[in-house]
């Protein structure tokens, strides 16, 4: 069983989602199915079919989250240090074409959220950054062509 690297915050978010699915969403969908059944003929009951579909999604997500959280390898990034990019690092890069500066935290795939500045260690830019230091340049192959970035900051915690 392969371990999944994760930050403490990432694990906490997944556990909170799992708890909500089990204690709020699952009971609500069971009630919705019961109410829809009371409306009679199930073959033409859109409410019933929608509730069953939602139940299927919820149960699938619960199974996925139980699997991921059971295999989580929590890495306390507050105890990490150094000048080399690795899991947990917060990294600033400068787009060598646009001169635009962007900051990312390198996290596990299940906690990545680009809008929040968290990118997966397995993403193209995440892979390119691993092992790099301030001043290093990286090339990231994108659908529109290669992009080049310079690492301008690496920090932990």
From Swiss-Prot:
Coiled-coil ranges (or none): 46-67
- Keywords in alphabetical order, please: Coiled coil, DNA-binding, Transcription, Transcription regulation
- A GO term for molecular function: DNA binding
Q: Tell me a GO biological process for this protein.
A: regulation of DNA-templated transcription elongation
One Pfam match = GreA_GreB_N
Keyword Coiled coil, does the record have it?
yes
Hydrolase as a keyword of this entry, yes or no, is: no
Question: Could you tell me which cysteines form disulfide bridges?
Answer: none
What InterPro entries does the database record attribute to this sequence?
A: GreA/GreB_C_sf, TF_GreA/GreB_CS, Tscrpt_elong_fac_GreA, Tscrpt_elong_fac_GreA/B, Tscrpt_elong_fac_GreA/B_C, Tscrpt_elong_fac_GreA/B_fam, Tscrpt_elong_fac_GreA/B_N, Tscrpt_elong_fac_GreA/B_N_sf
Q: Which family does it belong to?
A: Belongs to the GreA/GreB family.
The record, for NCBIfam families, names:
greA (TIGR01462), PRK00226.1-2 (NF001261), PRK00226.1-4 (NF001263), PRK00226.1-5 (NF001264)
Reported function: Necessary for efficient RNA polymerase transcription elongation past template-encoded arresting sites. The arresting sites in DNA have the property of trapping a certain fraction of elongating RNA polymerases that pass through, resulting in locked ternary complexes. Cleavage of the nascent transcript by cleavage factors such as GreA or GreB allows the resumption of elongation from the new 3'terminus. GreA releases sequences of 2 to 3 nucleotides.
From the Swiss-Prot or TrEMBL record, give the protein name: Transcription elongation factor GreA
Record organism: Rhodospirillum rubrum (strain ATCC 11170 / ATH 1.1.1 / DSM 467 / LMG 4362 / NCIMB 8255 / S1)
Q: Which gene encodes it?
A: greA
């Amino acid at each position: 069983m392969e371990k999944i690297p994760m930050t403490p915050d990432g694990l906490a978010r997944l556990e909170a989602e799992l708890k909500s699915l089990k204690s709020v969403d699952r009971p609500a969908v069971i009630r919705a199915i019961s109410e829809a059944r009371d409306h009679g003929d199930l073959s033409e009951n859109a409410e019933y079919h929608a509730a069953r579909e939602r139940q299927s999604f919820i149960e699938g997500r619960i199974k996925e989250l139980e699997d991921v959280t059971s295999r989580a390898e929590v890495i306390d990034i507050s105890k990490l240090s150094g000048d080399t990019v690795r899991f947990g690092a917060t990294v600033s890069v400068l787009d060598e074409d646009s001169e635009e500066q962007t900051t990312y935290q390198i996290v596990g795939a299940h906690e990545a959220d680009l809008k929040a500045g968290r990118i997966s260690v397995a993403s193209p830019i995440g892979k390119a950054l691993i092992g790099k230091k301030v001043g290093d340049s990286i090339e990231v192959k994108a659908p529109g062509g290669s992009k080049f970035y310079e690492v301008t900051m690496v920090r932990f915690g």
